[in-house]
Amino acid sequence: MKVVIFDMDGTVIDSGEAIYKTVNEVRDELNLPPLDKEFIIKAINEPGRNLALEFYGIDTPSRSLKEGFEEKFKKFYDECATTYEGVKELLQKCKEAHFEVVLASNAPHDTLEKILKKNEIYELFDEVIGASKEIPQKPDPAMLHLAVSKTGADKAIFIGDSLKDELAAKNANMPFLQVSWGFGDESKTATYNAKNVSEAWEIILNF
């Protein structure tokens, strides 16, 4: 049995506008000029970057800054986040082919159900896995191992858009499909690449 594991932001859900608006609203409160959207999206998808320093000039953000960011992000996420074109149909095809379908996101686990239901795709996932005290964020492979163990699958592929995703798949010894319809670009080191949903479906069918 196959399990197809999807990253969320930049792969299934387009949250770029929400992230962009949140970062720049916090910067505005700190009397800093706005940052370019492309810079923000690239920064959040690269492991090891000090985002507080790059976005706000603060080495260690205060609790109030973190809470303010989270509050703003929830607001903008609810307003702006939508599924990428064709992705709902891709999820439906996976279900129709009797593949297990799992979401593995670095977002907090307790925030995932709401956004997936809002976009009418929650019921298309057999398992939804987010970050928590027990489950570390990618590139740690824990989420991917959990997706396999929960579904009992003997073949798995992870679909994402960032280096964090690719490293998680590598750490889990799992094939990785890099998609470039969202935040990501083509990867020279990924197992597979797809520019669009049709290419992704052909790879999922045949891996």
PLM feature spans:
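Conserved Lys-Pro-Asp/Glu-containing loop-to-beta segment of HAD-superfamily phosphomonoesterases
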Residues: 3, 137-166
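Glycine-rich phosphate-binding loop signature in dinucleotide/nucleotide-binding domains
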Residues: 96-99, 150-154, 207
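Acidic, Mg2+-coordinating phosphoryl-transfer loop and its flanking beta/alpha structural elements
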Residues: 157-194
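Short, acidic loop-to-helix structural element flanking the phosphoryl-transfer center
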Residues: 75-103, 109, 113, 138-141
